[in-house]
């Protein structure tokens, strides 16, 4: 039984006709032929929202006065034809909050009942900040997955519709494992380029937003990002069996000569891979081209003699050679002349040099420089080579 304004009580299944009512002052519900109507001071509500304080609900009455049930209704609110979409349940009550219909979720304002469109923050029992979702600007249906909105990419959980924030893995047509991207922690917009997150540096492709992993070229230099986490790496790194070095501040891959921890290291000018030990020995030795010969000399400041020079060069690589050429000749492993490689010692009677390739030796002559190993003079005095 429904209580009516005006102290008239009607059963919903009663067939009560308008002629039986004092319509001039009648207010409230009226039922006829299974339809519900509403009167205000005897006037039938038509194309009108009505609030019933006793049920604490809003209702909509069509142009013929019948109450809308299980229906979406557009209500014009302004002279320009704009208004709001509303929804009424099977009892005719205006729907408020989340509503699931025909396979889609919708949201209706808790005060006005207006269908939400665009971004909406929904209350969540397990999160005081709620969750941001997105409703289609035309249909009002909750959207899922990647969405391009006003010039920005967003991602909404495929089950809950919740907007993604932070580092997120999303589907990628080119990779069964998906791609890692980053959404701003506040706006949810996809971010690009270098990003500083929780004390670590990452890089996201400037077109696709995909997180960089491994050795990665950008802005004129190579960088290295952890193959799992994507965090930028610094210092010495082993990649596919080769050694590389990445600047400890910028993360950029170094090439050529690098001085660190009191020693010199050499990396390929193109690939950045550390050169083999022999090649590094040659590169370092060539730093002293033109240094004068000094008998007994053991440093660039005083000049070098032959064994002082080789001892100094090899010490940069942790190789401890004896002081004299004859003692150095007895160190290491003997190498046939046909197998000699850059960085090997070439030993003569009373002299020692470094083989640099292409039948060239490099030694403390006066000044330090190159000589032709195949020349008759050096062949005449050659004793052997060692490694």
Regions found by a protein language model. Give the residues of each.
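Extracellular adhesion/carbohydrate-binding repeat motifs centered on closely spaced tryptophans
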Residues: 1-280
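Aromatic- and glycine-rich peptidoglycan recognition patches
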Residues: 14, 273-284, 319-336, 350-352, ...
């Amino acid at each position: 039984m429904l209580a009516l304004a005006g102290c008239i009580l009607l059963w919903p299944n009663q067939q009560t006709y308008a002629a039986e009512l004092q319509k001039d002052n009648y207010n409230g519900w009226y039922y006829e032929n299974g339809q519900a109507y509403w009167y205000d001071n005897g006037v039938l509500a038509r194309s009108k929202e009505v609030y019933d304080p006793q049920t604490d609900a809003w209702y909509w009455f069509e142009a013929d006065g019948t109450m809308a049930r299980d229906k979406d209704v557009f209500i014009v609110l302004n002279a320009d034809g704009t208004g709001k979409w509303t929804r009424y349940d099977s009892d005719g009550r205006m729907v408020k909050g989340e509503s699931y219909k025909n396979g889609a979720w919708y949201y209706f304002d808790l005060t006005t009942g207006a269908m939400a469109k665009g971004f909406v923050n929904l209350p969540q029992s397990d999160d005081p900040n709620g969750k941001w979702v997105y409703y289609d600007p035309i249909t009002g249906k909750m959207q899922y997955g990647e969405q391009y909105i006003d010039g920005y990419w967003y991602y909404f959980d495929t089950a809950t519709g919740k907007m993604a924030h932070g580092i997120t893995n999303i589907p990628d047509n080119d990779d069964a494992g998906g791609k890692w991207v980053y959404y701003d922690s506040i706006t949810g917009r996809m971010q690009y380029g270098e990003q500083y997150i929780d004390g670590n540096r990452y890089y996201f492709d400037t077109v696709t937003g995909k997180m960089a992993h491994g050795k990665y070229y950008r802005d004129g230099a190579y960088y290295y990002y952890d193959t799992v986490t994507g965090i930028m790496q610094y210092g010495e790194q082993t990649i596919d069996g080769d050694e590389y070095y990445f600047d400890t501040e910028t993360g950029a891959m170094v090439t050529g000569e690098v001085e660190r921890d009191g020693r010199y290291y050499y990396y390929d000018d193109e690939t950045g891979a550390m050169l083999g030990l022999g090649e590094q020995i040659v590169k370092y030795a060539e730093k002293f081209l033109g240094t004068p010969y000094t008998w007994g000399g053991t440093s660039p400041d005083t000049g070098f003699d032959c064994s002082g020079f080789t001892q100094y060069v090899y010490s940069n690589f942790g190789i401890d050679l004896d002081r004299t050429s004859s003692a150095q000749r007895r160190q290491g492993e003997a190498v046939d002349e046909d197998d000699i490689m850059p960085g090997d010692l070439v030993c003569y009677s009373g002299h020692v040099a470094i083989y640099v390739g292409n039948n060239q030796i490099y030694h403390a002559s006066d000044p330090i420089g190159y000589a032709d190993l195949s020349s008759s003079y050096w062949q005449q005095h050659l004793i052997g080579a060692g490694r």
